[in-house]
């Protein structure tokens, strides 16, 4: 507690760095997960293998995954960013897929009747 009170500038800088890294990794993860979930929804054969690989990645301890990326990206925020994006994928892709699968077919039919296209 003494360190926090004695160094508020350092704590604030590190807090903002942490929030920025987390927010940026979540943004990247969403940009990857939405099209991937849509692809898996349209190509059901791929859903099982892709979700299995993402599940296996999710079981790797976080520190081990970050250490695995250090030789590839170096000892910097990029290693952490890649690990965070990979960890988010199983959660996001599975939920995007569940959301798309949960759309009532009657709603899709009504939307097509009103002119909805593929996108």
Name what the model sees in each region:
Residues 1-25:
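Periplasmic/extracellular loop-to-transmembrane helix junction in inner-membrane transport proteins
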Residues 14, 18, 55-59, 88, ...:
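Residue-level signal for discrete positions within transmembrane alpha-helices
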Residues 16, 42, 72-74:
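Helix-loop interface residues and adjacent transmembrane-helix termini in multi-pass membrane transporters
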Residues 22, 26-38, 42, 89:
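Hydrophobic positions within alpha-helical transmembrane segments of bacterial inner-membrane proteins
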Residues 27, 31, 53, 82-86:
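Hydrophobic residues within alpha-helical transmembrane segments
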Residues 36-69, 84, 94-98, 102, ...:
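Cytoplasmic-entry segments and transmembrane alpha-helices of multi-pass inner-membrane transporters
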Residues 49, 74-82:
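Membrane-water interface of transmembrane alpha-helices in multipass transporters/channels
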Residues 112-119:
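Amphipathic cytosolic juxtamembrane alpha-helices at the membrane-cytosol interface
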């Amino acid at each position: 507690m003494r360190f926090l009170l004695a160094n508020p500038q350092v704590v604030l800088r590190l807090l903002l760095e942490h929030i920025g890294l987390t927010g940026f990794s979540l943004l990247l993860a969403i940009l990857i997960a939405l099209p991937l979930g849509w692809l898996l929804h349209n190509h059901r054969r791929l859903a099982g293998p892709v979700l299995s690989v993402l599940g296996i990645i999710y079981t790797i301890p976080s520190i081990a995954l970050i250490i695995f990326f250090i030789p590839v990206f170096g000892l910097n925020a990029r290693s952490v960013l890649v690990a965070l994006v990979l960890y988010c994928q199983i959660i996001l892709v599975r939920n995007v897929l569940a959301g798309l699968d949960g759309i009532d077919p009657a709603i899709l039919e009504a939307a097509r009747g009103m002119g909805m296209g593929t996108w």
